[in-house]
Amino acid sequence: MEGPVKLILLDFDGTLADTRRANALAYAATLREAGYPLTEEEYLGRYFGVRCDEFLRSYGIDDPAERERLRLRKIELYPAFFDTVELNRPLWEFCRQFRRQGGRVWIVSTGSRANIDNAMAHLGIGGPETPEARCPAGRVDGILAGPDVARSKPAPDCFLEAMRREGVTPRETLIFEDSAVGLEAARASGAAYIRVTLPE
């Protein structure tokens, strides 16, 4: 990496927050309601980090209307499992310090905006619309969610779009990611990246 970092891009699920169990339980409950026998272990082993529509399609749900219905139902059920979500506090504190020194921080995720906003509110870290008075230094500068770009990870589009919106180059950007598809997207973006591994 050459020159100072001006922008940090964070994946959300599995990087900034450990949402593995909450996502697995919410998807399992959603699909069980619809008669599909997904287990928590199967979701975590094969699908965690994959955009919802792609996951449901690869799971064998071909009807787009049914996939959309299940996606919306999962968003409804997801907050019921937030007691299992944990903030990656060292990474969050690092990003807060980076922002205090003038850097910019975005969340760039394949997840839905509603899921990210709900989880951030639960964790007490707010989102870009949270007034500073209510959440001092606890904001991010932007959020790009799955539907905001045409091609999801492993394509680098989401990272490149966040850089474009901030007016920075890949050489001025640092990405934190956990999943194989996210790391592939980070590499393809041309930015420096750090792999995050959360404890089991």
Features from the language model and the residues they span:
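Active-site neighborhood of HAD-like aspartate-dependent phosphohydrolases
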Residues: M1-E42, A188
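Asp-based, Mg2+/Mn2+-dependent phosphohydrolase catalytic module
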Residues: M1-K6, R96-R99, S112-E200
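Conserved hydrophobic/aromatic "anchor" residues
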Residues: L10-F12, Y78, F159
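Short beta->alpha linker loops
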Residues: A22, Y47, R51, R73, ...
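An amphipathic alpha-helix signature
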Residues: A24, A28, E40, G49-D53, ...
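A metal-dependent, Asp-based hydrolase signature
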Residues: A34, F48-Y78, Q97
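Short, acidic loop-to-helix structural element flanking the phosphoryl-transfer center
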Residues: P79-D117
